[in-house]
From Swiss-Prot:
It comes from Ixodes scapularis (Black-legged tick). The keyword Ribonucleoprotein applies. It holds the Pfam family Ribosomal_S21e. This is Small ribosomal subunit protein eS21. It comes from the Eukaryota. PANTHER family: 40S RIBOSOMAL PROTEIN S21. Belongs to the eukaryotic ribosomal protein eS21 family. Disulfide bonds: none annotated. Keywords: Cytoplasm, Endoplasmic reticulum, Ribonucleoprotein, Ribosomal protein. Its main location: cytoplasm. The keyword Endoplasmic reticulum applies. One of its GO terms (molecular function) is structural constituent of ribosome. Component of the 40S small ribosomal subunit.
Length: 83
């Protein structure tokens, strides 16, 4: 990407935590991104599409990442509501 002066610069797009909507900064080495594969209900095979979930290090430090992933997957309809 080029700026107005014609110099090549890198484009940094920060990620946001899927649970807390905090910006995950570049030095947050405890943050993770999990891609859940979307599965066809008829054949039971992965379609090649994924749904990414990003969890920041603060949520992981509290030990809440597994509950957050489960809640997000329920909200998106990947896990039944009565799970």
């Amino acid at each position: 990407m080029q700026n107005e002066a014609g110099e090549y610069v890198d484009l940094y797009i920060p990620r946001k935590c899927s649970t807390s909507n905090r910006i995950i900064h570049a030095k947050d080495h405890a943050s993770i991104q999990i891609n859940l594969a979307i599965v066809d209900e008829q054949s039971g095979r992965a379609t090649g599409e994924t749904k990414p979930y990003a969890i920041c290090g603060a949520i992981r430090r509290m030990g809440e990442s597994d509950d957050c992933i489960t809640r997000l997957a329920k909200d998106d309809g990947y896990i039944p509501k009565d799970f």
